[in-house]
Amino acid sequence: MKRVGFLTSGGDCQALNATMRGVAKGLYQIYKDEVEIIGFEDGYKGLMYANYLMMKQSDFSGVLTKGGTMLGTSRQPFKLMRVPDENGLDKVELMKHTYYKLKLDALVVLGGNGSQKTANLLSQEGLNVIGLPKTIDNDLWGTDMTFGFQSAVDIATNAIDCIHTTASSHGRVFICLLYTSPSPRDGA
């Protein structure tokens, strides 16, 4: 029996559910009934505190076009991963404990820069981790395009097209602010 954990971490974006569905579908095709998928709720928090769902094939039905993440997400700053809690355990030790307690064969992490840094740290600790790059900023080093980016561009373009029509009709100017974070590519 193979046991694979899924978690989504950091900001929300389109295609999280679709990506998990694609990975799950591949696992079920290869391993049939010999695979268990464990979904960690609220990102790395779920892995730290063993908050998880035993997922079934049916959990991945009907999610292809749904945005967001069925598992929930949270932000866990990378720089705090090694800070001990009140019991003297750092977050990495808590995550390793859950990983080994659940006898995972691999952990699939869907996340951006900080989430992938943590995934790399867990890999350096001996865990089998697969990092799937996700960000609407498209600023992850080593990738041409991250999932989430094109959806964000398409939605923003559509909204701006609609606003342009209204602005033209009423002789007004609109200023549109789109969320992004400083990019390492920009020297930030």
What are these regions (language model features)?
Residues 5, 29-31, 61-65, 98-102, ...:
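Solvent-exposed alpha-helices and their adjacent loops that cap or buttress functional pockets
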Residues 1-48:
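N-terminal phosphate-binding or glycine-rich loops at protein starts, especially the Walker A/P-loop
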Residues 19, 23, 113-127:
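Short Gly/Thr/Asp-enriched flexible loops that form oxyanion-binding sites at enzyme active sites
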Residues 9-12, 40-45, 75-76, 112-115, ...:
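Short, ordered loop/turn segments at secondary-structure junctions
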Residues 50-107, 147-161:
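Glycine-rich oxoanion-binding loops at beta->alpha junctions
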